A protein has these predicted regions:
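Metal-coordinating catalytic core of metallo-dependent amide/deamination hydrolases
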Residues: 1-110
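Alpha-helical segments flanking ligand/cofactor-binding loops in enzyme cores
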Residues: 56, 92, 117-118, 145, ...
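Glycine-enriched alpha-helix->loop->beta-strand junction motifs that scaffold or abut catalytic
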Residues: 62-67, 99-102, 119-128, 149-154, ...
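Short acidic/histidine-rich active-site segments
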Residues: 68-75, 128, 137-140, 145-171, ...
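Histidine/acidic-residue-rich catalytic or RNA/ligand-binding cores of hydrolases
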Residues: 76-88, 116-120, 138-147, 162-177, ...
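Long hydrophobic segments that form regular secondary structure
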Residues: 112, 116-124, 130-136
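C-terminal structural cap/anchor segments
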Residues: 178-228
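C-terminal cap of metal-dependent C-N hydrolases
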Residues: 218-248
């Protein structure tokens, strides 16, 4: 597991300071134990619940030891709050505080503009799309095609909306085609996100190769109880994953 605790100003300064300390203590514990199955990030909620003062405290407590996990531009309220109260968009604000980097994960990134995508790209920051959660909350669709085209490391998550990653895969594909009004886009992008990029994201935190079957790699294997109704081969396995299988 790679874990963190969500820092927020929502419950007052005392709780916020406790959350910051919880992250710092857990990072220290992981550094001491060096358990290859356990890693730490520094968690934050969303920018509209985190003040500049709190960001400074988070960065000081982290001291460059690990990356950050934070919800970004999930809804337009995050963008409006950032512009109104801080005079800049969310991604710029994160960059100004030193939050971005190649071990930081930005959740959602639905309402990011071109300039923000460039910052994400140039800082090698990771993004994780949560298609079902975003649709369920009616807050928009992540610009997956544009992010993928820029070479941004883009993974797939759930935001705790489901525990079925193949369900998320289906929804990710359908949402991108619906959003772009094109019936032939998204296939390569969403399969890359789940089967390749998620492993690359994991490798940022665990000292073993993931997502491949080869000597020395992690035993990153699941067995599916699946009876295909049409021919099944290595040439059409993605189609069976999307249209035939479930994760349950």
């Amino acid at each position: 597991s790679c874990l963190c605790y969500e820092v927020s100003d929502r419950d007052g300064e005392e709780k916020c300071l406790q959350a910051i300390q919880e992250n710092a203590d857990f990072i220290t514990e992981c550094e001491k134990n060096k358990d290859p199955m356990l890693a730490a990030m520094f968690g934050g909620h969303a920018l509209f619940t985190i003040s500049d003062k709190t960001f400074d405290r988070m960065v000081e407590a982290n001291n460059g030891r690990t990356g950050y996990h934070i919800h970004v531009s999930e809804g337009m309220n995050d963008v409006y709050d950032s512009l109104q109260n801080y005079g800049r968009r969310p991604i710029q604000r994160l960059q100004d505080h030193g939050i971005l980097g190649d071990k930081t994960i930005l959740g959602h990134c639905i309402h990011v503009n071109t300039a923000e995508m460039e910052i994400i790209q140039h800082t090698n920051t990771m993004v994780v799309n949560n298609p079902e959660s975003n649709m369920g909350n009616a807050i928009g669709i992540c610009p997956v095609l544009q992010l993928h085209k820029r070479g941004i490391l883009l993974g797939m998550g759930t935001d705790a909306y489901t525990n079925d990653m193949l369900e998320s895969l289906k929804v990710a594909l359908c949402s991108q085609r619906s959003q772009n009004c094109l019936p032939n886009v998204g296939w390569c992008e969403v399969t890359d996100m789940l089967f390749r990029n998620n492993a690359k994201i994991g490798e940022k935190y665990f000292p073993v190769q993931l997502g491949v079957l080869k000597p020395g790699a992690a035993a990153d294997i699941i067995v599916m109880d699946y009876k295909p109704f049409t021919p099944f081969s290595d040439e059409n396995i993605d189609g069976h994953m999307i249209f035939g299988m479930t994760g349950r």
